[in-house]
Structure formats: C-alpha cells, structure tokens
Curated annotation (Swiss-Prot):
Keyword line: Ribonucleoprotein, Ribosomal protein, RNA-binding, rRNA-binding
Keyword Ribosomal protein (UniProt): yes
Lineage per the UniProt record: Bacteria, Pseudomonadati, Campylobacterota, Epsilonproteobacteria, Campylobacterales
Classification via CDD domains: bS6 (cd00473)
GO terms, molecular function: small ribosomal subunit rRNA binding; structural constituent of ribosome
InterPro entries, alphabetized: Ribosomal_bS6, Ribosomal_bS6_sf, Ribosomal_S6_plastid/chlpt, Transl_elong_EF1B/ribsomal_bS6
Similarity field: Belongs to the bacterial ribosomal protein bS6 family.
Pfam families attached to this UniProt entry: Ribosomal_S6
Gene this chain is encoded by: rpsF
Function: Binds together with bS18 to 16S ribosomal RNA.
Any one annotated GO CC term: cytosolic small ribosomal subunit
GO terms of biological process kind: translation
NCBIfam families linked: S6
Name assigned to this protein: Small ribosomal subunit protein bS6
C-alpha cells in the first residue's frame, strides 16, 4: 500500500451538516476501496485564488491515507461524480524522502486534531522599541 494525500474543496453554499456529510462520504469512498485513513485536517473556509464557476470561496479538507495503487482510479472517478466538490487533488508519496514528509504531515494533522479548540496558538506581537517611542510622542 502507498501513502496518499487528498485535498478536496467543497462548495461554500452547503450547510455545516452537508459539508460534514460530504467529507464522511469521501472517507467512506476511501475505506470502501481498501484504504486506511491516517489523519484528516479540516482547513476551513478559504478564499480561492480565482473563481471556480460562481464560487469565490470553498471549504478545504485534507485527508491522509494509505491504499493500494490500483484503487486510486476508482477513488478519483467517484470524486469526479460528486457534484458538491469544486476541486480535488491527489498527491502520491512513494520515495523514502516523500514518505518521511508524509509521516510528518500526518503527525502534525493528528496533533492539530487532538488540540482543544480553545488552546489555539496565539503568537505574541513584538513592537520594536523605535515604534514604541514614536507612539508616545
């Protein structure tokens, strides 16, 4: 079995329940073809670089999984049939370097999934001393 990553963009006009149902259907497609889902990363609603049809935004979701290479054509065929998906891309990780990168991505996605929503990292903004002096005047 090889390691793969799928980025799918779901239509923004769907409700949260419909989006979740579509993501569950996508995961079912993968598992029904013998795949094992390693991690998933919901990236949320994002602005697209260019409009796809009449959509300027989309719900991005990444799925990391392992599956037999012969099943990829069927998985992609089922993705093409789904009218709720704006776009999808499948990335194959097969060299040792790529597999190492895939493992790191999976670990990062799993860590993000287990982190409570309230504990999101907040970066501290550092104001240079020169700017602080200007503000005081």
């Amino acid at each position: 079995m090889r390691n793969y990553e799928n980025l799918v963009i779901v239509k923004p006009t769907l409700t949260a329940e419909e989006i979740q149902a579509n993501i569950s259907a996508i995961e079912e497609i993968i598992t029904s073809n013998g795949g094992e889902i390693a991690a998933r990363d919901a990236m949320g609603m994002r602005k697209l670089a260019y409009p796809l049809g009449k959509n300027e935004r989309g719900y991005f979701h990444v799925i990391y999984y392992s599956v037999d290479p012969s099943a990829i054509s069927e998985i992609e065929r089922r993705f093409r049939i789904n009218e709720e998906l704006l776009r999808f891309v499948t990335i194959k990780y097969d060299t040792n370097r790529e597999v190492t990168a895939w493992n790191q991505l999976v670990q990062k996605a799993q860590k993000k999934a287990t982190q409570p929503a309230g504990e999101a990292k907040v970066e501290e903004v550092v104001i240079p001393a020169a700017l602080e002096e200007d503000e005081e005047e």
